[in-house]
Swiss-Prot record:
This is Contactin-associated protein-like 3. It comes from Homo sapiens. GO terms for cellular component: extracellular region; membrane; plasma membrane. InterPro entries: ConA-like_dom_sf (IPR013320), EGF-like_dom (IPR000742), FA58C (IPR000421), Fibrinogen-like_C (IPR036056), Fibrinogen_a/b/g_C_dom (IPR002181), Galactose-bd-like_sf (IPR008979), Laminin_G (IPR001791), Neurexin-related_CASP (IPR050372). One of its GO terms (biological process) is cell adhesion. Keywords: Cell adhesion, Cell membrane, Disulfide bond, EGF-like domain, Glycoprotein, Membrane, Repeat, Secreted, Signal, Transmembrane, Transmembrane helix. Residues 31-177 form the F5/8 type C domain. The chain crosses the membrane at residues 1246-1266. Residues 1-25 form the signal peptide. Residues 26-1245 are extracellular. Residues 183-364, 370-545, 793-958, 1015-1203 form the Laminin G-like domain. Residues 584-792 form the Fibrinogen C-terminal domain.
Length: 1288
């Protein structure tokens, strides 16, 4: 088989490289539709036009409107015609035509393409051929198929040659089709971890295909490793792609030597590059773009024997592979496939196989640059000088990667000499040549070839020559000499020697970018240069490198590092806890309350209490309860402090308590909370009270403001009472603290410090008035804060003219606004703040549009988010708007963020001076009707409720949160409204916890069982007739929903058994081969319906989920949330007189089939969780009893945290709670079952219970016999009279 695959591969490799694309090889057969003909005129643009009838909008192929094509004002090779396809398309061919009925046509041209209209890339034919053949007349069409095709949104046609007897004239068409693009963006600190489906045999073939666009020159693209050091890694290193392959331990005879394959160059150019990796046994094929490296490994294919996970974008676990602990990838991956699986699609759908780490998004940002580029060493720009002046003065900025190159040459008048400015070894050097004298040289700067912009100022006058590079100034004194400025300055290179200019560039011309050129006091206008109105040039491309130094001053916040790119500055937010263009937005929620309402369970979390404010995030423990979210901040003090007697007046103890968070962070968190407390547990033996008898404080504590407090507990300041004194239950009513009594015994006080304006405690000082034998000990607990008073702070706006007003918003350089809203109206203004000319406004402009508009002096700017569904659905929607010096962004809910870049060199400060209006405007028009909640400006929360209480037309608070947050209540839990938030009612769920998501699991030892009784228990004092009557209370079902999860290695096993008083039953078992079997017997006169589901061997020690849904005769079975199967019952549709549900071993399965009896005898050994039959949850009823017990337990059943985290099934499990059978302290299985609430009886009580149960069973047998007889008779008379009830 491998030889056949290799033969096929060899055939493919013999094909021309132009006909095979590594990613998505081969074009669709119909990918040749015209793309430009249907575009509007606005989609066409050009460098210039001869007249309005020669505009780019008339450049469609075979069209005759206008003048019959596009013709620029001037015919030269710097003209261009551009098309915007509207979105990225796959382009497979182009066609050109001359101007209709004219002598204007192009004979050759260049084709460039771009994703975003900037950062153009030139299409190359056959690697080295750049130009395309054009037309020979005005009417014929020249069609060219692109091999290989490419994907782009923008295309540019650059004429190189044209009819010498005419002008440039073009009509064009572009062919292709829609392009499927699944994009994932990594910001340099993120990764995707893809867990593969485990297979019993290692694969003989692995195929990985992707495209990538690199924003940086280094980074891990993918990594996969095994148990013995074997790994494969694809890494971008200095713009080259390196594939590392290591089979592991070199001492093993079968391993191969490490392999390193390198392909590609300049792959960090922010353009797409394709990669294909094929591991075919020992054959390795590594393809980048059109270049393929074949490698035949010696030895076996042990490098394929890797773990069942692969990471993209980085190595997610630091230190996991020390040899490859490298920088993560910064850029985009497109159409990422592993063995045919679309990994990006799985990540978008949040499939369980994918783990996203860090800031991973699914859109690829496009660079925007307007550069001025010197294309070759022959490039030059000649500009007129200030002829006749007695000085030379030139300033400019440059950017380059070259260590050497000519920058500037000028010749002085009257033969007085010349000067040349050039780069050598990354340093700037200036040489002045004068007749009869040695050259005068000046050197300034270092490392100027770092790709950054550097400013240069050169001046020469009578007695000195001065060069300033950035902040490095170099001065060269001159002998008094006449400096007479020349006529022309040459930047970047020189004219041909035949021109007689005298310009020389022995180190070669400059390759890079120039900007901000001034000669004398006059700035050079680049637009005039482009239009040919100023100077002359060669091989100069304008609009290719026009950036300024935007990192001085740095607008990066929160310690973010500023770095340059082609068109703007960027902030490296790695390790800051913030994100965004300026590291302004926090990565973390502001409180545990916010974490809770994102569905997060209890655990350690970072919180950022002031949001985008100056305070950083810090780590806390969030304790999520059903009623609230508690923030727990631990201190670093001792667990317990012990005190012993000392002479009078001497300090007994002064202990300081430090916290992981700073004072400002703690203050912000405490102020945000609804209430906070800290508990002090005090134990004392013959110790003194906290104060002397004359009232002098002997003990005190210090809060966060460094103030001393003598109040203990929740009392008023200086009340000097412990908690027992406040509650009036001290052991001695004469005192206000238990320790005041001074008894010769150990007593205790629990002190709750709850004045949150003073918390947390930073120091406790305790002294004593002189009891040598006294002793005490105290423990200070963590800081506990409940809730978030800003998260639910809200106001309801009832009239269009109503609003709340606050002081003006001060956000000059950075302004962010975030809030929740809900409404039923179609429009309204959320907030508005005005200045003299500046303003900021956020509004609901239409039912599906939210708009953020502002003006900082550059003219009004708008950012709009459109939704496919209306926002006026009376549910909470979250809005976040940000405006900074780089632009503006707006995001609503989880919709894609919309951004608007700021204009270059425009105004950056937002100056506002009016009041801030919330819910309306200053003109009282277009007011908002609805609710606004949790409004924050630059991280500062506004108290809406306080203002609403005194504002007509506005009410504090909002109702109706379950419509938005009800989805947090999982697994059948019901959302219940609270005044401030919601809570989940788990009464009818098999789970518990704040979101009904905590698994209730139990380990069943061999021979154990748990029985849930659907009928109520009746005492033996009732007469037999009443007992029989009670058994007539049927539970008859025509439908039921059953869910359970399990893990075991034993077969056969009984997972669940539901019995009936009529010998009807349902059994769910694992057969001897581990297959799932379900049997329904709904008519005791017929054989049961038996169904086998050969999904897999489910007795494999792994966790499996089973869901059974019956609707009369239709049964739907779902396994592991994926595999589904539907079956039809033939034995009936009614489950009559349901008696009990049994988990584990069944002592007697009367009337059951042989397979069910065998499984019932074997029982179940392993872990069961989330068991639910209709509304009955037997595990929950046993482990979380909330009323009279319906559960009986036999044998050893131990609760477990989670089945997935438990011990291997089939092995003894460590019991996590007292055993649920036989009574505490006894060993061995119980002989008979008993209600769970009586599990702790003494032995005599147990014996009595056993006797009672035996008697009860005998009575049940008699009653059942009577019941069967009566039921037969009843069915014969009228079967329709059988009572029915709803699902239990």
């Amino acid at each position: 088989m491998a030889s056949v695959a290799w033969a096929v591969l060899k055939v493919l490799l013999l094909l021309p490289t132009q006909t095979w694309s590594p990613v998505g090889a081969g074009n669709p057969p119909d990918c040749d539709a015209p793309l430009a003909s249907a575009l509007p005129r606005s989609s066409f643009s050009s460098s210039s036009e001869l007249s309005s009838s020669h505009g780019p909008g008339f450049s469609r192929l075979n069209r005759r409107d206008g003048a019959g094509g596009w013709t620029p004002l001037v015919s030269n090779k710097y003209q261009w015609l551009q098309i915007d396809l509207g979105e990225r398309m796959e382009v497979t061919a182009v066609a050109t035509q001359g101007g209709y009925g004219s002598s204007d046509w192009v004979t050759s041209y260049l084709l460039m393409f771009s994703d975003g209209g900037r950062n153009w890339k030139q299409y190359r034919r056959e690697e080295s051929i750049w130009g395309f053949p054009g037309n020979t007349n005005a009417d014929s069409v020249v069609h060219y198929r692109l091999q290989p095709p490419f994907e782009a949104r923008f295309l540019r046609f650059l004429p190189l040659a044209w009819n010498p007897r005419g002008r440039i004239g073009m009509r064009i068409e572009v062919y292709g089709c829609a392009y499927k693009s699944e994009v994932v963006y990594f910001d340099g600190q993120s990764a995707l971890l893809y867990r593969l489906d485990k297979k019993p045999l290692k694969p003989i073939r692995d195929v990985i295909s992707l495209k990538f666009k690199a924003m940086q020159s280094n980074g891990i693209l993918l990594h996969r490793e095994g148990q013995h050091g074997n790994h494969i890694t694809l890494e971008l290193i200095k713009g080259k792609l390196v594939f590392f392959l290591n089979s592991g331990n070199a001492k093993l005879p079968s391993t191969i030597a490490p392999v390193t394959l390198t392909l590609g160059s300049l792959l960090d150019d922010q353009h797409w590059h394709s990669v294909l990796i094929e591991l075919l046994d020992t054959q390795v094929n590594f393809t980048v773009d059109k270049h393929t490296h074949h490698f035949q490994a010696k030895g076996d294919s042990s490098y394929l024997d890797l773990n069942f996970e692969i990471s993209f974008g980085g190595i997610p676990t630091p230190g996991r592979s020390r040899a490859f602990r490298r920088k993560s990838f910064h850029g985009c991956l497109e159409n990422l496939y592993y063995n045919g699986v679309d990994v990006t699609e799985l990540a978008k759908k949040h499939k369980p196989q994918i783990l996203m780490m860090g800031n991973v998004s699914f859109s690829c940002p496009q660079p925007q640059t307007v550069p001025v580029t010197f294309l070759s060493s022959r490039s030059y720009l000649a500009l007129p000088g200030n002829s006749g002046e007695d000085k030379v003065s030139v300033t400019f900025q440059f950017r380059t990667w070259n260590r050497a190159g000519h920058l500037l040459f000028g010749e002085l008048r009257r033969g007085s000499g010349s000067f040349v400015l050039f780069l050598k070894d990354g340093k700037l050097k200036l040489s002045l040549f004068q007749p009869g004298q040695s050259p005068r040289n000046v050197t300034a700067g270092a490392g100027l070839n770092d790709g950054q912009w550097h400013s240069v100022s050169f001046s020469a006058k009578w007695s000195h020559m001065n060069v300033v590079v950035d902040d490095d100034t170099a001065v060269q004194p001159l002998v008094a000499v006449l400096i007479d400025s020349g006529d022309t300055y040459y930047f970047g290179g020189c004219l041909d020697n035949s021109s007689g200019s005298g310009c020389k560039s022995p180190l070669g011309g400059f390759q890079g970018c120039l900007r901000l050129i001034t000669i004398g006091d006059k700035a050079v206008d680049p637009i005039l240069v482009q239009q040919g109105a100023l100077g002359s040039f060669r091989d100069l491309q304008i609009d290719s490198c026009g950036i300024t130094d935007r990192c001085l001053p740095s607008y990066c916040e929160h310690g973010g590092e500023c770095s340059q790119s082609w068109d703007t500055f960027s902030c490296d937010c790695l390790g800051t806890g913030y994100t965004g263009e300026t590291c302004h937005s926090s990565l973390y929620e502001q409180s545990c309350e916010a974490h809770k309402h994102r569905g997060n369970p209890s655990g350690l979390y970072y919180i950022d209490a002031d949001g985008s404010g100056p305070l950083g995030p810090f780590l806390v423990y969030c304790n999520m309860t059903a009623d609230a979210a508690w923030t727990v901040v631990q201190h670093g003090g001792p667990d317990a402090v012990t005190l012993r007697g000392a002479p009078s007046g001497h300090p007994r103890s002064a202990v300081s308590f430090a916290y992981a968070a700073g004072a400002g962070q703690l203050r912000s968190a405490v102020n945000l909370a609804e209430r906070c407390e800290q508990r002090l547990a005090l134990r004392c033996g013959t110790a003194r009270r906290p104060d002397s008898r004359d009232g002098t404080p002997l003990s005190w504590w210090v809060g966060r403001t460094n103030e001393t407090h003598t109040s203990w507990g929740g009392s008023l300041p200086d009340a000097q009472k412990c908690t027992c004194g406040l509650e009036g239950n001290c052991i001695d009513s004469q005192y206000y603290c238990n320790c005041d009594a001074g008894r010769n015994e150990w007593t205790s006080d629990t002190i709750v410090l709850s004045q949150k304006e003073h918390l947390p405690v930073t120091q406790i000082v305790m002294t004593d008035a002189g009891r040598p034998h006294s002793e005490a000990a105290y423990t200070l607990g963590p800081l506990l804060c409940r809730g978030d008073q800003s998260f639910w702070n809200s106001a309801s706006f009832n009239t269009e003219t109503s609003y709340l007003h606050f002081p003006a918003f001060h956000g000059e350089l950075t302004a962010d606004v975030c809030f929740f809203f809900k409404t039923t109206v179609s429009s309204g203004v959320f907030m508005e703040n005005l200045g003299i000319t500046d303003f900021i406004r956020i509004e609901l402009r239409a039912p599906t549009e939210v708009t953020f508009s502002f003006d900082v002096g550059n003219g009004p700017c708008e950012v709009t988010v459109q939704s496919p569904t209306p926002f006026n659905d009376n549910q909470w929607h979250h809005v976040r708007a940000e405006r900074n010096v780089k632009g503006a962004s707006l995001q609503v809910d989880q919709l894609p963020q919309k951004m608007q870049p700021a204009p270059a060199d425009g105004h950056v400060r937002l100056q506002l001076n009016s009041q801030l209006f919330i819910g309306g405007t200053a003109t009282r028009q277009r007011g908002f009707l609805g609710c606004i909640r949790s409004l924050q400006l630059n991280g500062v929360a506004l108290d809406l409720e306080e203002r609403a209480t005194v504002t007509p037309g506005v009410e504090p608070g909002c109702a109706g949160h379950c419509s938005t947050y009800g989805h947090l209540c999982r697994n059948g839990g019901r959302c219940r409204e609270k005044r401030r938030g919601v809570t989940c009612d788990c009464a009818f769920s098999a789970y518990d916890g704040p979101f009904c998501s905590n698994e209730i699991s139990a380990y069943f030892a061999t021979g154990s069982s748990m029985t849930y009784h659907f009928q109520e228990h009746y005492t033996l004092s009732e007469n037999s007739s009443s007992l029989v009557s009670s058994l007539h209370r049927d539970v008859t079902l025509t439908r039921e929903m059953i869910t359970l999860s399990f893990r075991t290695t034993r077969t056969p096993s009984l997972l669940l058994y539901v019995s009936s008083f009529y010998e009807e039953y349902l059994s769910v078992i694992l057969a001897n081969n581990g297959s799932l079997q379900i049997r329904y017997k709904l008519d005791r006169h017929q054989n049961p319906d038996a169904f086998t589901f050969d999904f897999k061997n489910m007795a494999d020690g792994q966790l499996h989920q089973v869901k059974i849904n019956r609707e009369e005769a239709v049964v739907m079975v779902e396994v592991n949330q994926s595999t589904k199967k539907q079956v039809i019952l033939s034995s009936g549709t009614e489950f009559n007189a349901v008696k009990s549900l049994i988990l584990g071993k069944v002592l007697e399965a009367a009337g059951a089939d042989p397979d069910t009896r065998r499984a019932a005898t074997s029982g179940f050994t392993g872990c069961l969780s989330a068991v639910r039959f209709g509304r009955a949850a037997p595990l929950k009823a046993a482990l979380r009893p909330s009323g009279p017990s319906r559960v009986t337990v036999r044998g050893h059943v131990a609760p477990m945290a989670r089945c997935a985290a438990g011990a291997a099934s089939g092995s003894p499990a460590r019991e996590l709670a007292p055993r649920l059978a036989g009574g505490a302290g006894r060993s061995g299985p119980a002989d008979e079952g008993e209600p769970l609430v009586n599990a702790d009886r003494r032995d005599s009580a147990v014996i009595g219970g056993v006797i009672a149960v035996v008697i009860f069973i005998l009575l049940c047998i008699t009653a059942i016999a009577i019941r069967i007889y009566q039921q037969r008779k009843l069915r014969k008379e009228n079967e329709s009279k059988v009572s029915k009830k709803e699902e239990c």
